[in-house]
């Protein structure tokens, strides 16, 4: 231990406890914390609350804050599972999930489920906010982003749950903020596949409006 002052420097040595054991890093056994299992193509979705930090900062009761996130995340997870999605994780107020059946890009039914799931989530906002009001909590809005591409599937040594890595995850996260409030942003990979499906064309012909969003590189 070294004690320094403006006027002088003094070095003092503390006694070492007799039970203390020095650890030689060379003797440590190296184990992989993250193991990459496989790579596959699939559709990935992010659903994220808009301005949740500002909203929850005005809620003084911690139990109310927990209920706020609980209602949103559990409702979104239930809808996602109903359409065949697998929940990957939540990061704060953002729920991340994927659709394993979309690994086959010709499976129109699987991609139709992706569309129906996202639309159902948007339509569920009134129901979610009704639950919020019953708990005397403020209303919320959210954004959904979805994209399709190659992901690396990994598993932690301390967890049995899969995690996903890769550029498509980064892109899906990036375009989420570009989605309109209570709307959906679709990445280029997913858009190209959906364009060939009649179900997507019928959406464009009806009440849903699609427009290109330019995202900066980097």
Question: Residue locations for each model-derived region?
Answer:
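Intrinsically disordered, glycine/charged-rich C-terminal tails and inter-domain linkers
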Residues: 1-30, 160, 181-218
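Catalytic NTP-binding/metal-coordinating core of nucleotidyl cyclase/transferase enzymes
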Residues: 30-113
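Conserved protein kinase catalytic core
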Residues: 54, 153, 193
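Hydrophobic alpha-helical membrane-association signature
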Residues: 68-72, 117, 121, 171
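Structural signal for well-ordered, non-membrane alpha-helices
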Residues: 73, 77, 119-122, 126-129, ...
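Catalytic core of nucleotidyl cyclases, primarily class III adenylyl/guanylyl cyclases
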Residues: 83-110, 128-167
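Catalytic/regulatory signature loops of cyclic-dinucleotide turnover enzymes
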Residues: 147, 167-192
């Amino acid at each position: 231990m070294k004690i320094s002052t403006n006027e002088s420097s003094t070095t003092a040595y503390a006694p070492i406890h007799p039970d203390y054991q020095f650890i030689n890093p060379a003797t440590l056994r190296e184990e992989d914390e993250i193991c990459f299992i496989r790579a596959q193509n699939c559709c990935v979705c992010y659903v994220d609350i808009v301005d949740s930090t500002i909203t929850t900062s005005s809620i003084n009761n911690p139990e109310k804050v927990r209920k706020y996130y609980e209602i949103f995340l559990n409702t979104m997870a239930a809808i996602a599972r109903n359409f065949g999605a697998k929940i990957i994780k939540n990061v704060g107020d953002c729920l991340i999930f994927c659709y394993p059946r979309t690994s086959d890009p010709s499976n129109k039914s699987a991609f139709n489920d992706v569309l129906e799931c996202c639309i159902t989530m948007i339509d569920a906002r009134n129901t979610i906010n009704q639950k919020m009001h019953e708990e005397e909590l403020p209303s919320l809005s959210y954004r959904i982003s979805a994209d399709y591409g190659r992901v690396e599937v990994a598993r932690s040594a301390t967890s049995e749950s899969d995690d996903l890595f890769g550029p498509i995850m980064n892109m899906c996260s990036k375009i989420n903020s570009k989605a309109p409030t209570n709307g959906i942003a679709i990445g280029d990979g997913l858009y190209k596949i959906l364009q060939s499906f009649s179900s997507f064309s019928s959406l464009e012909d009806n009440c849903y409006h699609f427009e290109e969003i330019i995202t900066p590189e980097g």
